UniProtKB/Swiss-Prot annotation:
Transmembrane segments: none annotated. It comes from the Eukaryota. It comes from Bos taurus. Residues 285-299 have a biased composition (Basic and acidic residues). This is Cilia- and flagella-associated protein 161. Microtubule inner protein component of sperm flagellar doublet microtubules. One of its GO terms (biological process) is flagellated sperm motility. The gene is CFAP161. Expressed in trachea multiciliated cells.
């Protein structure tokens, strides 16, 4: 049997080189920690910026203006083409590549996009309505007017623009292989978008009218004439979990009307301090709900039926002659 002939204090092998190597590794680790270049530090910094709480613009007149900070939300609708999909309202979010984000202190360009189940305005889903042809900040956005959508991602020194271009063999969306939508820092004609009224028969009548906030609209790319769409049934594994794919494609039904997957809302902030967006406001009761409440009150209180109101009077009994 092998027997250890040396005591615990005896050093064997290249012990001197191993000591110097451990010292160099520790010095390199401390230097990266002081500069903030460790992987955990970059990961924490990226999440802090992308998930930084943002304040949306409050619309006083109910319309969208240039310079407003909004969220692009795909309203909830039943998905009939697939059994497995993401339900609820989906907001357009920037999705940087996890590996590339850890190798650099800045956001990658171009940067990907996805649709996530979040209604809280943060750095990764808060967009700014920017001018495209010399419009004035604060001017009302109108149907058929060009505009740009910019996002900072929580960073203060960089602006990325929502862009798209024609599909090629080397450049397309990851799951559907349709026209890709991405974020870039270049200010060009690929950044221009237009808002259109959802109903095709009333679209020309609403041309030039102000775009209302928190209502369904169509967002079309000016260069390719493709509509922004959220594929709820196509999932992406992103830095923040499972989210839906976003592309540029117009889906039409048998009546040549855009499908609900092409509908979007420009969501603004709520005037109440305890709410973040207008989607958090409680909805007023509908007319049919009020009618049901009145019927329930009459059933619970039979004497209320004989109470006179503005619609009629109490029937009177006639004595026999």
């Amino acid at each position: 049997m092998a027997q250890n002939l040396y005591g615990p204090r005896v050093r064997i092998g290249n012990w001197n080189e191993d000591v110097y190597l451990e010292e160099e590794i520790m010095k390199d680790f401390l230097a990266k920690r002081d500069k903030g270049q460790l992987l955990i530090q970059r990961n924490r910094r990226l999440k802090e910026n992308l998930l930084r709480p943002m304040q949306l613009s409050v619309s006083e007149d109910g319309y969208i203006h240039y310079g407003d900070k909004v969220m692009l939300v795909s309203p909830d609708h039943p998905e009939t083409e697939a059994d497995l999909f993401l339900p609820g309202d989906l907001s357009l979010c920037m999705t940087p590549d996890e590996i590339k984000a850890h190798l650099s202190n800045e956001l990658e360009v171009p940067c990907g996009l996805s649709a996530a189940q979040t209604k809280i305005p943060v750095g990764r889903n808060t967009f700014t309505i920017l001018c495209a042809a010399g419009e004035v900040i604060g001017q009302v956005l109108r149907y058929g007017q060009n505009f740009r959508l910019g996002i900072t991602g929580g960073f203060d020194d960089r602006m990325l623009y929502l862009s798209s271009d024609h599909r090629t063999l080397l450049k397309s969306s990851k799951r559907s292989w349709l026209q890709e939508v991405f974020l870039t820092h270049e200010d060009s004609y690929l950044n221009c978008w237009q808002a259109a009224f959802p109903h095709p028969q009333l679209r020309l009548e609403y041309e030039g009218s102000p775009v209302p906030a928190n209502t369904k609209i169509l967002i079309t790319h000016c260069h390719t004439n493709r509509g922004l769409v959220a594929h709820r049934h196509l999932f992406l594994r992103t830095y923040f979990g499972q989210e839906a794919e976003v592309a540029a494609h117009t889906y039409l039904d048998s009546h040549r009307v855009e499908k609900p997957k092409n509908h979007w809302m420009l969501v603004t902030g709520a005037p109440r301090k305890d709410l973040s967006t207008m989607l958090d406001l409680p909805k007023p009761p509908a007319e049919d709900t009020r009618a049901l409440e009145q019927e329930r009150e009459q059933v619970s209180d039979p004497g209320a039926r004989s109470t006179p109101d503005a619609r009629g009077c109490v029937p009177q009994c006639t004595l026999p002659m």
